[in-house]
Amino acid sequence: MLIILITIILGLFISLITLPLGYYAPEWMLLIVIYWAIALPSNSKLFLAFLTGIIVDIVYGQVLGISSLFYVLLVYIILRLYNSLRYMTIAQQAVVLFIFIFLKQHLLVWAYYIIDRNIDYQALLVGSIVTASIWPLIYYTLRFIRRKFNIGGIN
């Protein structure tokens, strides 16, 4: 669990580095949480998604709880589709993640519209594409870390 938390913290630092890109920046934290939900499925990943979402809200200055709601919702869906996602190719997973992330971004726009905050919809679409396109990088990096530290009992 310590390695998982370290990867979340590293994802936070990478998110801070890409913060000036705004909505064009990839969602590093979400991808890391999704990877751990696919690699080691358990209900504790829902709590991890909630905490990560709260951290993202604080860092980005968003409405507190909105990211955690969407993170928990996405991780729940990932856990329900675990058997299907686990055996997909990386490209297929990236397409599925694009759809999930785009829906999350769309719901975020809707939630911000309710509280009278305008968001550039095109930037969210590009951000979803960028996020899905870096999935292979996140997947292979975290898989290497998982195997190196023998997390989950796999060599």
PLM feature spans:
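Terminal, non-globular segments
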Residues: 1-155
